[in-house]
Amino acid sequence: HICGYAHTNAGTGAKSEIGDAAYGGSVENDNSGTLRYIRLEYTGYAFSEEKEANGVSFYGVGNGTTVEYLQAYKGSDDGFEFFGGSVNVKYLVATDCSDDSFDWTEGWNGYGQFLVAYQGDKATIGYDCDCLIEADNNGKNAAATPVSAPVLANMTLVGNSSTANKRGIRL
């Protein structure tokens, strides 16, 4: 996971789900580096409902960070999860992730463009995804500010036959 110094609505002393790394602050243009042209295969693990390792977890990452051309492939939890921050992302692909393809919480308000989520059939991938998108503000305080409000454009979401009577997007 990547921990930055941009905003989060989780309060001071926010800690990552894995490793208890500190994150968050008030540096909206926080630069946590460049991630470009990366394929993450078979990553992640759900230790418990509150302790999950995703394909990539962005904790309070700012908009000075470059995130482009990433694929989360057959991960054991979410493909990409955003915990607050203002990071902008382009060209992300989540393929056959066991939980959500894209997930955000704690006030993420970045931009996402050219995003693709694809879920194969349960018989093929061995599990059933929860949602293509799961979006919330703060699990402990729905009115926490800043409110999650990302701007998304040019998305393609492809479910499968085993999710026909489930939620593709959970807001």
Predicted regions: what they are:
Residues 1-171:
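Beta-strand/loop edge motif enriched in small/polar residues
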